[in-house]
Amino acid sequence: MKVTAAFAGLLVTAFAAPAPEPDLVSRSAGINYVQNYNGNLGDFTYDESAGTFSMYWEDGVSSDFVVGLGWTTGSSNAITYSAEYSASGSASYLAVYGWVNYPQAEYYIVEDYGDYNPCSSATSLGTVYSDGSTYQVCTDTRTNEPSITGTSTFTQYFSVRESTRTSGTVTVANHFNFWAHHGFGNSDFNYQVVAVEAWSGAGSASVTISS
Protein backbone atom coordinates (compact mmCIF):
# COMPACT_ATOMS: atom_id res chain seq x y z
CA MET A 1 0.00 0.00 0.00
CA LYS A 2 1.25 3.47 -0.81
CA VAL A 3 1.20 5.47 2.40
CA THR A 4 2.30 8.89 3.52
CA ALA A 5 5.41 9.14 5.64
CA ALA A 6 3.31 10.06 8.66
CA PHE A 7 1.44 6.77 8.55
CA ALA A 8 4.11 4.50 7.10
CA GLY A 9 5.48 3.37 10.44
CA LEU A 10 2.05 2.78 11.89
CA LEU A 11 0.80 0.75 8.98
CA VAL A 12 3.63 -1.75 9.10
CA THR A 13 1.85 -3.31 12.03
CA ALA A 14 -1.68 -2.18 11.30
CA PHE A 15 -1.88 -4.01 8.00
CA ALA A 16 0.38 -6.91 8.90
CA ALA A 17 -2.42 -9.41 9.21
CA PRO A 18 -2.56 -11.51 12.37
CA ALA A 19 -1.75 -15.17 12.10
CA PRO A 20 -3.89 -17.52 14.18
CA GLU A 21 -2.99 -17.42 17.87
CA PRO A 22 -2.99 -20.37 20.28
CA ASP A 23 -5.64 -18.72 22.47
CA LEU A 24 -8.24 -18.55 19.71
CA VAL A 25 -11.29 -20.45 20.91
CA SER A 26 -13.54 -22.57 18.69
CA ARG A 27 -16.92 -24.11 19.58
CA SER A 28 -19.53 -26.06 17.70
CA ALA A 29 -22.65 -23.89 17.32
CA GLY A 30 -23.61 -20.31 16.56
CA ILE A 31 -20.79 -17.90 17.25
CA ASN A 32 -17.84 -20.24 17.62
CA TYR A 33 -14.70 -18.20 17.11
CA VAL A 34 -12.86 -15.72 19.32
CA GLN A 35 -10.36 -13.48 17.59
CA ASN A 36 -7.76 -12.48 20.16
CA TYR A 37 -4.71 -11.11 18.42
CA ASN A 38 -2.75 -9.04 20.93
CA GLY A 39 -5.81 -8.50 23.09
CA ASN A 40 -3.40 -8.09 26.01
CA LEU A 41 -2.62 -4.61 24.64
CA GLY A 42 -5.91 -3.54 26.20
CA ASP A 43 -8.68 -4.95 28.33
CA PHE A 44 -10.42 -7.55 26.14
CA THR A 45 -13.38 -9.43 27.59
CA TYR A 46 -16.01 -11.54 25.85
CA ASP A 47 -19.01 -13.81 26.36
CA GLU A 48 -19.09 -16.15 23.40
CA SER A 49 -22.51 -17.61 24.21
CA ALA A 50 -24.06 -14.13 24.44
CA GLY A 51 -22.25 -12.82 21.35
CA THR A 52 -20.77 -9.87 23.21
CA PHE A 53 -17.28 -8.48 23.63
CA SER A 54 -15.59 -5.35 24.92
CA MET A 55 -12.18 -3.81 24.36
CA TYR A 56 -10.65 -0.82 26.10
CA TRP A 57 -7.22 0.51 25.19
CA GLU A 58 -5.16 3.40 26.44
CA ASP A 59 -2.96 5.89 24.63
CA GLY A 60 0.45 4.43 23.94
CA VAL A 61 -0.65 1.18 22.28
CA SER A 62 2.65 -0.15 20.97
CA SER A 63 1.40 -2.59 18.33
CA ASP A 64 -1.64 -3.70 16.35
CA PHE A 65 -4.46 -5.64 17.97
CA VAL A 66 -7.52 -7.30 16.40
CA VAL A 67 -10.20 -8.68 18.70
CA GLY A 68 -13.76 -9.87 18.13
CA LEU A 69 -16.24 -12.69 17.82
CA GLY A 70 -17.58 -14.63 14.86
CA TRP A 71 -17.33 -17.91 13.03
CA THR A 72 -14.60 -20.38 12.15
CA THR A 73 -15.88 -20.44 8.57
CA GLY A 74 -17.09 -17.21 7.02
CA SER A 75 -19.98 -16.76 4.62
CA SER A 76 -21.91 -14.15 2.68
CA ASN A 77 -24.73 -14.21 5.25
CA ALA A 78 -25.90 -10.86 6.60
CA ILE A 79 -24.56 -9.86 10.02
CA THR A 80 -26.49 -7.74 12.52
CA TYR A 81 -24.61 -6.00 15.31
CA SER A 82 -24.83 -3.10 17.74
CA ALA A 83 -21.93 -1.32 19.38
CA GLU A 84 -20.72 1.54 21.46
CA TYR A 85 -17.47 2.57 19.81
CA SER A 86 -15.21 5.51 20.63
CA ALA A 87 -11.91 5.92 18.83
CA SER A 88 -11.34 9.65 18.47
CA GLY A 89 -7.59 10.18 18.22
CA SER A 90 -7.01 6.48 17.53
CA ALA A 91 -6.12 4.67 14.32
CA SER A 92 -8.86 2.06 14.63
CA TYR A 93 -11.66 0.21 12.82
CA LEU A 94 -15.00 -1.33 13.73
CA ALA A 95 -15.48 -3.84 10.94
CA VAL A 96 -16.59 -7.18 9.62
CA TYR A 97 -13.21 -8.84 9.15
CA GLY A 98 -12.05 -12.14 7.73
CA TRP A 99 -9.96 -14.21 5.37
CA VAL A 100 -10.37 -16.29 2.23
CA ASN A 101 -8.09 -19.30 1.87
CA TYR A 102 -7.66 -19.27 -1.92
CA PRO A 103 -6.90 -17.03 -3.61
CA GLN A 104 -5.66 -15.85 -0.23
CA ALA A 105 -7.25 -12.56 0.77
CA GLU A 106 -7.90 -10.48 3.86
CA TYR A 107 -11.03 -8.34 3.94
CA TYR A 108 -12.65 -5.54 5.92
CA ILE A 109 -16.15 -4.07 5.74
CA VAL A 110 -15.46 -0.97 7.82
CA GLU A 111 -18.55 0.40 9.55
CA ASP A 112 -16.78 3.08 11.60
CA TYR A 113 -13.20 4.17 12.12
CA GLY A 114 -11.07 6.56 14.10
CA ASP A 115 -8.44 8.82 12.55
CA TYR A 116 -7.49 6.73 9.52
CA ASN A 117 -9.48 5.66 6.45
CA PRO A 118 -7.65 2.78 4.74
CA CYS A 119 -8.96 3.81 1.32
CA SER A 120 -7.15 7.13 1.61
CA SER A 121 -3.91 5.48 0.52
CA ALA A 122 -4.95 2.29 -1.31
CA THR A 123 -5.99 1.55 -4.90
CA SER A 124 -9.59 2.61 -5.47
CA LEU A 125 -12.05 0.15 -7.00
CA GLY A 126 -14.94 2.61 -6.96
CA THR A 127 -17.97 2.53 -4.70
CA VAL A 128 -20.78 0.18 -3.77
CA TYR A 129 -24.12 1.15 -2.21
CA SER A 130 -25.37 -1.09 0.57
CA ASP A 131 -27.48 -0.84 3.70
CA GLY A 132 -28.29 2.83 3.33
CA SER A 133 -24.85 4.19 2.52
CA THR A 134 -22.16 4.39 -0.12
CA TYR A 135 -19.00 2.48 0.69
CA GLN A 136 -15.61 3.40 -0.75
CA VAL A 137 -13.97 0.23 -2.09
CA CYS A 138 -10.22 -0.22 -2.37
CA THR A 139 -7.55 -2.90 -2.52
CA ASP A 140 -3.90 -3.47 -1.76
CA THR A 141 -1.35 -6.24 -2.19
CA ARG A 142 0.68 -7.29 0.83
CA THR A 143 4.01 -8.91 -0.02
CA ASN A 144 5.70 -11.35 2.36
CA GLU A 145 3.57 -10.30 5.32
CA PRO A 146 2.13 -12.29 8.24
CA SER A 147 -1.04 -14.13 7.25
CA ILE A 148 -3.21 -17.10 8.19
CA THR A 149 -0.61 -19.39 6.62
CA GLY A 150 2.47 -17.80 8.13
CA THR A 151 4.24 -15.37 5.81
CA SER A 152 2.76 -14.90 2.35
CA THR A 153 1.69 -12.50 -0.37
CA PHE A 154 -2.02 -11.77 -0.45
CA THR A 155 -4.65 -9.21 -1.46
CA GLN A 156 -6.58 -6.97 0.90
CA TYR A 157 -10.11 -5.76 0.13
CA PHE A 158 -11.76 -2.87 1.95
CA SER A 159 -15.26 -1.42 1.85
CA VAL A 160 -15.38 1.72 4.00
CA ARG A 161 -18.78 3.12 4.90
CA GLU A 162 -19.11 6.84 4.18
CA SER A 163 -22.06 7.35 6.55
CA THR A 164 -20.39 5.66 9.48
CA ARG A 165 -22.50 3.83 12.05
CA THR A 166 -22.19 1.64 15.11
CA SER A 167 -25.22 -0.59 14.66
CA GLY A 168 -27.17 -2.20 11.86
CA THR A 169 -27.18 -5.08 9.43
CA VAL A 170 -24.27 -5.63 7.05
CA THR A 171 -25.36 -7.28 3.80
CA VAL A 172 -22.04 -9.04 3.34
CA ALA A 173 -23.00 -10.49 -0.06
CA ASN A 174 -23.14 -7.01 -1.62
CA HIS A 175 -19.47 -6.47 -0.83
CA PHE A 176 -18.33 -9.97 -1.74
CA ASN A 177 -20.11 -9.77 -5.09
CA PHE A 178 -18.55 -6.39 -5.87
CA TRP A 179 -15.08 -7.54 -4.87
CA ALA A 180 -15.51 -10.70 -6.98
CA HIS A 181 -15.30 -8.51 -10.08
CA HIS A 182 -11.80 -7.58 -8.92
CA GLY A 183 -10.36 -11.00 -8.12
CA PHE A 184 -11.99 -11.84 -4.79
CA GLY A 185 -12.57 -15.60 -4.57
CA ASN A 186 -16.00 -15.38 -2.87
CA SER A 187 -15.64 -18.94 -1.60
CA ASP A 188 -13.28 -21.12 0.44
CA PHE A 189 -13.71 -18.89 3.48
CA ASN A 190 -11.56 -18.97 6.58
CA TYR A 191 -12.72 -17.25 9.78
CA GLN A 192 -15.02 -14.21 9.85
CA VAL A 193 -15.61 -11.90 12.81
CA VAL A 194 -17.06 -8.60 13.87
CA ALA A 195 -13.85 -6.99 15.04
CA VAL A 196 -12.21 -3.98 16.56
CA GLU A 197 -8.69 -3.19 15.41
CA ALA A 198 -6.38 -0.41 16.57
CA TRP A 199 -2.72 0.47 16.49
CA SER A 200 -2.49 3.91 18.11
CA GLY A 201 -4.29 6.27 20.46
CA ALA A 202 -6.95 5.31 22.98
CA GLY A 203 -10.48 4.05 22.65
CA SER A 204 -13.20 1.67 23.69
CA ALA A 205 -15.77 -0.63 22.16
CA SER A 206 -18.63 -2.79 23.42
CA VAL A 207 -20.17 -4.97 20.72
CA THR A 208 -23.16 -7.30 20.52
CA ILE A 209 -23.62 -9.63 17.54
CA SER A 210 -27.14 -10.90 17.01
CA SER A 211 -26.72 -12.79 13.72
UniProtKB/Swiss-Prot annotation:
Cellular component GO terms held in the UniProt record: extracellular region
Top-level division of the source organism's lineage: Eukaryota
Annotated signal sequence range: 1-27
GO biological process terms on file: xylan catabolic process
Pathway: Glycan degradation; xylan degradation
Keyword tRNA processing: no
Catalysed conversion reaction: Endohydrolysis of (1->4)-beta-D-xylosidic linkages in xylans
Entries under Pfam families matching the protein: Glyco_hydro_11
EC number assigned by the record: 3.2.1.8
MF terms (GO), sorted A to Z: endo-1,4-beta-xylanase activity
Keyword Signal appears in the UniProt entry: yes
Entry keyword set: Carbohydrate metabolism, Glycosidase, Hydrolase, Polysaccharide degradation, Secreted, Signal, Xylan degradation
Classification via PANTHER family: ENDO-1,4-BETA-XYLANASE A-RELATED
Function: Endo-1,4-beta-xylanase involved in the hydrolysis of xylan, a major structural heterogeneous polysaccharide found in plant biomass representing the second most abundant polysaccharide in the biosphere, after cellulose.
Protein name, entry field: Endo-1,4-beta-xylanase A
Species assigned in the record: Aspergillus tubingensis
GN (gene name): xynA
